[in-house]
Design a protein with these regions (language model features):
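Hydrophobic alpha-helical segments at protein termini of multi-pass membrane proteins
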Residues: 1-149
Length: 149
């Protein structure tokens, strides 16, 4: 869903004219999706009048959920950025690889928070390590030649 939103919102447009753009469009789509998902998550307790649960659960949810969506979408964006000036076949392979890795990251996050006794803070630390890697790749992608030859 996030990839479709990013494709409609920017990836398929003429404005997507340099490698960094794919990361920006996908991260933007992830933030929008996470905001919508978090809002829906909060409506249940709020409708039941349980404001305290909504605030406490919402804080943890916003931290983990938003960052894991950014991490998984940025992963796809990184693969797209490195395939920017490559042939169409390589772009398709790159998107597929990025989607599979992003799905794996999100699935691992879901398994860890739902089915293990690992503390939220340990899981959150792993997500932050991934976000730091995204920032490193962001800087590396900025150095790529934006013009295809």
């Amino acid at each position: 869903l996030k990839f479709a939103a990013a494709t409609i919102g920017g990836l398929s447009r003429r404005a997507n004219n340099e490698p960094l753009d794919s990361m920006v469009y996908l991260i933007t789509a992830a933030l929008g999706y996470a905001a919508l998902e978090n809002a829906f998550f909060l409506f249940g307790p709020l409708q039941a009048g349980d404001i305290a649960t909504s605030v406490v659960a919402g804080n943890f949810r916003f931290l983990g959920s938003t960052l894991v969506h950014v991490l998984s979408s940025a992963t796809i964006g990184i693969f797209l950025a490195y395939a920017f000036c490559r042939p169409r076949t390589l772009k398709i392979l790159s998107v597929t690889t990025g989607l599979l890795l992003a799905t794996l990251l999100h699935t691992l996050y879901n398994i860890l928070i739902l089915n293990t006794d690992i503390s939220f803070f340990a899981i959150f630390g792993g997500i932050w390590a991934g976000i730091v890697l995204v920032l490193v790749f962001f800087e590396l992608v900025k150095r790529l030649n934006p013009y295809c030859r």
